[in-house]
Amino acid sequence: MASRGVNKVILVGNLGQDPEVRYMPNGNAVANITVATSESWKDQQGQQQERTEWHRVVLFGKLAEITGEYLRKGSQVYLEGKLQTRKWKDQSGQDRYSTEVVIDQSGSMQMLGSRNQGGQGAPMGGMPQNGGYQSAPQQAAPAQNQYAPAPQAAPAYQAPAPQPQSGYNQPPAQQSYGQQQAQPHVQPHAQPQQGGYAPKPAAPAYQAPAAPAQRPAPQPQQNFTPDLDDGWDDDIPF
């Protein structure tokens, strides 16, 4: 392909006059238009300069029909085709050569901008290849619709987010409940130890009655001895 070269032309400009459309014997349409492209620059003196180039463009087939129906003088268009030079004869019979931009089925044409009659030109964009131009906003519209459900999925994500938090709150509640159960076990165990320690001080009270310190028994003996002195000596046979 590189050895054969590339023949491709892209133009963005405005029509200099209304399209001329004619039909060939086989019924195919042919449209001739002239497109102006302008460029501006500043010269060495700083003055603004502008230059306009005129391009002859020939369209074939369906594109030619759409061009004649929707394009008018002043319409801004995007054209993509190839350069082609043809030979023809003038009225005097002399050969003439013309280099034109040919746009056939392999090329493309799109309308840019609009005029007062742009309402007619707008549908043109959607008829042939420009249908891709109108389909672009249609693709943008579903893109917005796809973005609208995205916020709706956030809340759904947010919705499950509190659920794991609530589940996390439940395990600590069980831990606190386990701690509360552990506390009652510790407290009753501490109480029996204190209860066991309480009877130990009661042991001295038990020693008080057990102690035979109360020996009143010798007292009757003392009372008994005076009785012996009083009368028991006489009764003793010895």
From Swiss-Prot:
Q: List, for all copies, the residue spans of the domain called SSB.
A: 6-110
GO MF, any single term:
enzyme activator activity
Residues within the DNA-binding region(s): 54-60
Query: Which keywords has UniProt assigned to this entry?
Result: DNA damage, DNA recombination, DNA repair, DNA replication, DNA-binding
Extent of Acidic residues compositional bias: 227-238
Q: Which residues form a coiled coil?
A: none
What function does the entry list?
Plays an important role in DNA replication, recombination and repair. Binds to ssDNA and to an array of partner proteins to recruit them to their sites of action during DNA metabolism.
Protein name stated in the entry = Single-stranded DNA-binding protein
Organism expressing this protein natively: Shewanella oneidensis (strain ATCC 700550 / JCM 31522 / CIP 106686 / LMG 19005 / NCIMB 14063 / MR-1)
As recorded in Swiss-Prot or TrEMBL, the protein's gene is named ssb
